[in-house]
Amino acid sequence: PAAAGPRDGRAGAKAEVDRLYGEAEAATERYNAARENTRRLRAEVDRAQDRAARAQEGVNRMRDTLGSMAGAQYRSGAIDPSVQLLLSSDPDSYLERAAFLDREGERRAALLRKLRGAARTIARTRAEAGHALAGLERDREAVARHKRTVEDKLARARRLLASLPAEDRAALDHAASDAPSAPGAASPRATAALDAARRALGRPYVWGANGPTAFDCSGLTQWAYAQAGVSLPRTSQEQRHAGRVVPLSQARPGDLVAYRADASHIAMYAGNGQVIHAPHPGAPVRYDPVGMLPVSSVTRV
């Protein structure tokens, strides 16, 4: 068979670089999701520990009250058997005999019930904190794992690009740079988000970044909509569900365009068949044709 020519070699290199960037983007979105979950779990742990601390303060106050009641009886010359049970290690037996106590004893019984309820709350809250901490550790490991995957894919892509002649590298990284003349956006907030994305043109791609000086793909769209007062989820997979899905043929400026079956890349439609997006490391925020990758969905926020 005939030897592959330079064009075939460049096409093969482009396919391999595209594959590596695609895999790196998928890993980046998994990294973003794991990092967001880590933040959520950290907040859960903090809230659980705060609830446990407040409950413990209540327990301490009730124990002080019970101790004062026992001390008063001791100074009066006798300790009621009910108090002995109250301060024993088996409060359930006290509750079983609470019906035999006098009114003062009933007050102590009610206090003991509160004490036992607070103790259960502390145990439950500490268990919740322990569960959240275990999840936090798992997600920290996932963050580190996805980070290693991204770095490996990007390093391989950089090595492949570095091995190509300069003109081939330029051809692989060619992108549209002229702003399209767009029809009207779907809403004022979409207009504001698109304006923000345009202000980000030329800023660098940094995986895991969400502005204002650098972005990954979902970080750009999240930041742009935040400038319009709209809170979007962090990952491209979540963002594709952040509004109403419309056909690509009906895309309006400001719509989110998700790519590949796993929605591992996302861009903002800018009109006239163009999108603004953060492509990959080494390529700044820029315009590209909407069909640069297989489109999986278009979402109107």
Residue map of PLM features:
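Extracytoplasmic
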Residues: 61, 80-82, 89, 96, ...
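Amphipathic heptad-repeat alpha-helical coiled-coil "stalk/arm" segments that mediate oligomerization
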Residues: 64, 68, 74-80, 85, ...
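Short, exposed beta-strand "edge-strand" segments with a Pro/Gly-rich flavor and a Y/T-containing core
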Residues: 51-53, 82-89, 157-164, 231-233, ...
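Intrinsically disordered, low-complexity
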Residues: 2-71, 92-95, 99-204, 301
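Residue-level marker of structural boundaries
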Residues: 75, 103-104, 230, 284
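Short, highly charged low-complexity linear segments
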Residues: 84-86, 119, 124-128, 152-163, ...
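Peptidoglycan cell-wall recognition and remodeling modules
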Residues: 180-301
